[in-house]
Amino acid sequence: MGPQGFYWSHPRKFGQGSRSCRVCSNRHGLIRKYGLNMCRQCFRQYAKDIGFIKLD
């Protein structure tokens, strides 16, 4: 078992490493509120399609 076997061998059941964006699988800037589970970049892209409106 070489180094590639140890890379993702630790179980990720909780914490930042266990969650990812449902669109692009990114782990940074995740919006979990309301069960969105999207990174902020994908949220900006799909916010209008989801039904969010930008208030002035």
From Swiss-Prot:
Entry binding sites for Zn(2+): 21, 24, 39, 42
Cofactor-binding details, from the entry: Binds 1 zinc ion per subunit.
Protein name listed in UniProt: Small ribosomal subunit protein uS14
Family listed: Belongs to the universal ribosomal protein uS14 family.
Record InterPro entries: Ribosomal_uS14 (IPR001209), Ribosomal_uS14_CS (IPR018271), RIbosomal_uS14_euk_arc (IPR039744), Ribosomal_uS14_sf (IPR043140)
Underlying gene: RPS29
Positions of post-translational Omega-N-methylarginine modification: 12
N6-acetyllysine: residues carrying this PTM: 48
Organism of this sequence: Sus scrofa
GO cellular component, one term: cytosolic small ribosomal subunit
Cell compartments where the protein resides: Cytoplasm, Cytosol; Cytoplasm; Rough endoplasmic reticulum
Gene3D superfamilies linked: 30s Ribosomal Protein S14, Chain N (4.10.830.10)
